[in-house]
């Protein structure tokens, strides 16, 4: 095989790890995927075995080489993208985690988050980190591990332990302990990092009693962090030179380099991120302020809205209600529905995310009649995803005083043409679906490739991931607003139901 050079992206997700090899045109040459165990010690708790994650990553690296015939010395650089917020604490000498990784979804630290709120820290944390106080972020997870593993606090203070999000853990393992680093986008999700001053926040560390010695060094999203130890990369010493949390990597992979550009990834949940440029903008309306990416000595901020249930609502139709045999079938049924959209599904199975942040809300359905069919119910479930996206897009426009013209989309549910057309209709703007839906891995590859000169600059990248399809709005204004008003009523009723005591 010719000695063509490639970039490898490692995409470490919530349920599986993947390795993807990309060529110079940004095309996928090969990929390998491996699922790993989800651990649920108690209701609402979600954990992973960090060593099992590492083993799965080693396995998919090998799989990507085997499938493509590409050799380790043909990999110019490695980019890493990861499930964000998930927290690992390990022993510096042995490299062994002292507890399972606590996953972003896990609610086991909710009492600690509530305690911080009741102590009056909400505003302080928001101003420094851009985040709301929530168990979602890493800070309370680190504190929980130090509290619940015997001797951990003392060992952390002695400098015997290290903390990292998954990116940090993987770089540490790949370099055989030579690099203990993270990047701006992952640091910004810990609730320990001051995103204005770009440093770990001493006051927050003191409030939570987390020793600074355990924290990784924070670096930009596109630079060489270290090289793979040859025995961890099949003989190759390859620079690891790009890193970003999954949603920020997707923003970069979608080429959303200009302020005002917005992308939405329709995955298990839905994550909408807007590039707000070099000015940090705190949301007045419950969106998160975070770092999009930092390259070439500049940091670009972002606003983010998280929807907990998106693609997983379609999985619920399939696995929970058995209304469809596979996810793509939901599109066919939705098109067969002939009602007037008076049914509303509010899929608040784990509470409502942005901009409501109501963790007590639960799923509900409104507007059922004797004539409601399976097709109507499926259509209403798909529409609920689009309504939630509108909630966030409207909020972003209020926060930034800008009119969003186009929404760039990717992720599994973005393949559903019915959903994409309804999304365009209910927003009244164009929906641009990426040609290459692997935008998360592609973003990590782009960041890595830029750092080593594999791609020259952002202008060269702009030629690599064009729009695959454009969905334009076709619904009249009064119909659009009437439907959305019904959705707002349904959400309000859902929240009222959650508040009523017996």
UniProtKB/Swiss-Prot annotation:
PROSITE patterns reported for this sequence: FGGY_KINASES_1, FGGY_KINASES_2
EC number, UniProt record: 2.7.1.30
GO biological process, alphabetically ordered: glycerol catabolic process; glycerol metabolic process; glycerol-3-phosphate metabolic process
Reaction equations catalysed: glycerol + ATP = sn-glycerol 3-phosphate + ADP + H(+)
Keywords associated with the record: ATP-binding, Glycerol metabolism, Kinase, Nucleotide-binding, Phosphoprotein, Transferase
Top-level taxon of the source organism: Bacteria
Post-translational modification: The phosphoenolpyruvate-dependent sugar phosphotransferase system (PTS), including enzyme I, and histidine-containing protein (HPr) are required for the phosphorylation, which leads to the activation of the enzyme.
Residues that bind ATP: 14-16, 268, 311, 315, 412
Entry-linked InterPro entries: ATPase_NBD (IPR043129), Carb_kinase_FGGY (IPR000577), Carb_kinase_FGGY_CS (IPR018483), FGGY_C (IPR018485), FGGY_N (IPR018484), Glycerol_kin (IPR005999)
Means of activity regulation: Activated by phosphorylation and inhibited by fructose 1,6-bisphosphate (FBP).
Record pathway: Polyol metabolism; glycerol degradation via glycerol kinase pathway; sn-glycerol 3-phosphate from glycerol: step 1/1
Residues at which sn-glycerol 3-phosphate binds: 14, 84-85, 136, 246
Residues with Phosphohistidine modification: 232
Residues that bind glycerol: 84-85, 136, 246-247
Residues that bind ADP: 14, 18, 268, 311, 412, 416
GO cellular component: cytosol
Any GO molecular function: glycerol kinase activity
Family: Belongs to the FGGY kinase family.
Subunit structure: Homotetramer and homodimer (in equilibrium).
HAMAP family, per the entry: Glycerol_kin
UniProt xrefs under NCBIfam families: glycerol_kin, PRK00047.1
Biological role: Key enzyme in the regulation of glycerol uptake and metabolism. Catalyzes the phosphorylation of glycerol to yield sn-glycerol 3-phosphate.
Name the UniProt record assigns to this protein: Glycerol kinase
Lineage per the UniProt record: Bacteria, Bacillati, Bacillota, Bacilli, Lactobacillales
């Amino acid at each position: 095989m010719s000695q063509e050079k490639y970039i490898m992206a490692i995409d470490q997700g919530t349920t599986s790890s993947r390795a993807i090899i990309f060529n110079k045109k940004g095309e996928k040459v090969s990929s390998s995927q491996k699922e790993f165990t989800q651990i649920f010690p108690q209701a609402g708790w979600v954990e992973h075995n960090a060593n099992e994650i590492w083993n799965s990553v080693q396995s998919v690296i090998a799989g990507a080489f085997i499938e493509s015939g590409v050799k380790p010395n043909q990999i110019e650089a490695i980019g890493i993208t990861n499930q964000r917020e998930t927290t690992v604490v390990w022993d510096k000498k042995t490299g062994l985690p002292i507890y399972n990784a606590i996953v972003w979804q896990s609610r086991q630290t909710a009492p600690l988050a509530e305690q911080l709120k009741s102590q009056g820290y909400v505003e302080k944390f928001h101003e420094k980190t851009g985040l709301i106080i929530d168990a979602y972020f890493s800070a309370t997870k680190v504190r929980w591990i130090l509290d619940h593993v015997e001797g951990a606090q003392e060992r952390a203070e002695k400098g015997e332990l290290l903390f990292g999000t998954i990116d940090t853990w993987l770089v540490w393992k790949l370099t055989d302990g030579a690099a203990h680093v993270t990047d701006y986008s992952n640091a910004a999700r810990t609730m320990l990092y001051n995103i204005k001053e770009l440093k770990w926040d001493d006051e927050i560390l003191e409030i939570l009693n987390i020793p600074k010695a355990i924290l990784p060094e924070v670096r930009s999203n596109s630079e060489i962090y270290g090289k793979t130890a040859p025995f961890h990369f099949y003989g190759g010493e390859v620079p690891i030179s790009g890193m970003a949390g999954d949603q920020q990597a997707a923003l970069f992979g979608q080429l959303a380099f200009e302020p005002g550009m917005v992308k939405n990834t329709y995955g298990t949940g839905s994550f909408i991120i807007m590039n707000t440029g070099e000015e940090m903008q705190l949301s007045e309306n419950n969106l998160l302020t975070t770092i999009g990416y930092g390259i070439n000595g500049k940091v670009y901020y972002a606003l983010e809205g998280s929807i907990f249930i998106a693609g997983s609502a379609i999985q619920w139709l399939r696995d929970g209600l058995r209304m469809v045999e596979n996810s793509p079938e939901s599109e066919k049924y939705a098109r067969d529905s002939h009602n007037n959209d008076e049914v509303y599904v509010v899929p608040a199975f784990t509470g409502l995310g942005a901009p409501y942040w109501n963790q007590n809300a639960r799923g509900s359905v409104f507007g059922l009649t004797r004539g409601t069919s399976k097709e109507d119910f499926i259509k209403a479930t798909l529409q609920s995803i689009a309504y939630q996206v509108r909630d966030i897009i409207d909020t972003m426009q209020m926060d930034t005083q800008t009119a969003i013209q186009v929404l760039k989309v990717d992720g599994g549910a973005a393949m559903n043409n019915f959903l994409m057309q309804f999304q365009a209709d209910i927003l009244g703007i164009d929906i641009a679906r990426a040609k290459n839906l692997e935008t998360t891995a592609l973003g990590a590859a782009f960041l890595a490739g830029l750092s080593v000169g594999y791609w020259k600059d952002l202008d060269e990248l702009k030629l690599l991931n064009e729009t695959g399809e454009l969905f334009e709005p076709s619904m009249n204004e009064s119909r659009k607003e009437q439907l959305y008003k019904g959705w707002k009523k349904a959400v309000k009723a859902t929240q009222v139901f959650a508040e009523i005591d017996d």
